[in-house]
Amino acid sequence: SRINNGAKFVKENFEILESVERDFGVSKFYIASIIGCETNYGSFLGTYNPLDTIFTRAFEPENSFWQKELIQLFILSKEYNLDPKTIKSSWSGALGLGQFIPSSYNFYGVDYDGDGVVDMYNSRKDGIASVANYLKENGWKTGSFAVSEVTVGKKFASLEDDDIAKLQLSFNLNK
């Protein structure tokens, strides 16, 4: 199961996760959870060719976002000696253990193993640290919760308890 795979991932990578947690201030369990959601703890890095995937999107009309990502893919390919025709990605061109789009790979990637290359495919240290760095650089606050309270919209505010129970939600909207 996913939970067992997560426990195994944390156990096998405990020292790395502990070190990254100290260095970046991001909980090892959140890091592991993201990697679990993105790649099933590294067991599935994708089956697509990122060059084909991003190239196709880059030349759709008025799609400057993917044109920039194509350039970023070429930059990371050259910098880290990755062949964009043979590495694997998700259907959306996301790369490596944390499934980063090329610009995020270039911007948030961390060479945590110190070999001079950010390698989110073959280095667990780099992949784990890059996920933590992404969270830290995007406002992660050490010791904070990853969720926040929200106000329920009018659509849900008028529902009776019986109506809410019929929705089969795993949380209570009326708290």
PLM regions and their residue ranges:
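Short glycine/serine/threonine-biased micro-segments
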Residues: 40, 44, 91-94
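Export/targeting segments at the very N-terminus of extracytoplasmic proteins
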Residues: 2-36, 46-72
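Hydrophobic alpha-helical segments
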Residues: 41, 52, 116-117
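Short, solvent-exposed loop/turn and secondary-structure capping segments
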Residues: 44-48, 87-88
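Flexible, glycine-rich surface segments
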Residues: 80, 84-175
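Sec-exported extracytoplasmic/periplasmic mature domains
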Residues: 22-26, 36-43, 55-59, 75-82, ...
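A contiguous strand-loop segment
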Residues: 11, 62, 66-88, 172-174
